[in-house]
Amino acid sequence: MNKKLLSRLAPGLFAVVLFTACRPAATVKGNLDVIPQPQEIVLARDTTPFIIDRSTTIVYPATNEKMHRTADFLATFIKEMTGTEVRVSDKEKSSNAIILAVDSTMGHPEGYKLQITPEKVLLTGGSEAGVFYGIQTIHKALPILKDGKVAAALPAGTVTDFPRFRYRGFMIDVGRHFFPVSYLKQMIDLMALHNINYFHWHLTEDQGWRIEIKKYPKLTEIGSKRDSTIIDWETKKFDGKPHSGFYTQDEAREIVRYAADRFITVVPEIDLPGHTTAALASYPELGCTGGPYKVLCSFGVFPDVLCAGNDQTLQFTKDVLDEIMDIFPSEYIHIGGDECPKSRWEKCPKCQAKIKELGIKTLPKHSKENQLQTYFMSELEKEINAHGRRML
């Protein structure tokens, strides 16, 4: 072979060698049978799968920050699952590409269509959220490989999916047991993996107040700590270990942002007017008896609740909710309302005076004290609605 011919062929030969080096000889095919089960999976069983290698590119629409972030998520998932590093770009590419797109005419904003061929993967969502759920399907469909020396492949076919329910929630109770921010982020990642779109954050309980309220610092100075925790209900055995912890407002906002990046809305819950012993231990004047109260170490339903006849208590709850709504942009604000015994209200002069002031009468199925709670919750609903939010 003469030198001129060799010089002409050399670049092409180098490109072939380089491309071949990018593609491992062996492949392991993933599985589209994922949870939650998609609405429809149609496999092209006799078709070559799509092989993911180091030259694979994830393509997202230019100038779309949410899609860029989603593309980065997918690249991370592929690296974690297979050991292969792929590229992310906003430049068009027609082959060996995973192409992300939005089509608002699909009919289901959170739905998506995933089309896998040997040449490319086209993922189209009804919105950015739909695309995100689509990459989670790819995530779950990937084979688990060790070091990237064996190539991952996605089976050829089409997946069509959309959620059956608009609200898909998961609750974490940090009032009874505190969990650090790092753990909550892990749980949010698991929620995202399973297409959950609401994180219900139960922040307060008889056993602990877990969110910083700047106007009422004792809520966390006192209310976030308890002496011990019951570990055997029958014998009333306690572990003897102090339990404490709370989230600063900045940490709560960090969780809100982390969840939002994964298309999850954080719904805060401040349990009112029952399950508030931790608040009463912090501010005894908010209770019917004036205390003293102690952050509880056992679990159940307890008689001491916020005094609904005390105007100071109502102002306290509104102040708390105002700060909560400043932290959490969620449309929904959860205020509990459950398991509020009325024994203290029945004997409380302030509660009875408020009942008389409101002209509340006993009804066949509703005591005066039950109706007092209705009044109390209605006042809080007005406060929430005034901020353009909805009460749960």
Where are these regions (language model features)?
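Bacterial N-terminal signal peptides that target proteins for export
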Residues: N2-P11
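Residue-level preference for nonpolar/small residues embedded in alpha-helices
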Residues: T70-A71, Y183, E251, F376
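Contiguous, structured surface segment used for ligand recognition
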Residues: R23-F165
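C-terminal motif of bacterial Sec signal peptides marking the signal peptidase cleavage site
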Residues: L18-A21
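Active-site neighborhood of glycoside hydrolase catalytic domains
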Residues: A279-E285, T289, K294-L392
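Feature activates predominantly on carbohydrate-active enzymes
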Residues: T105-Y332
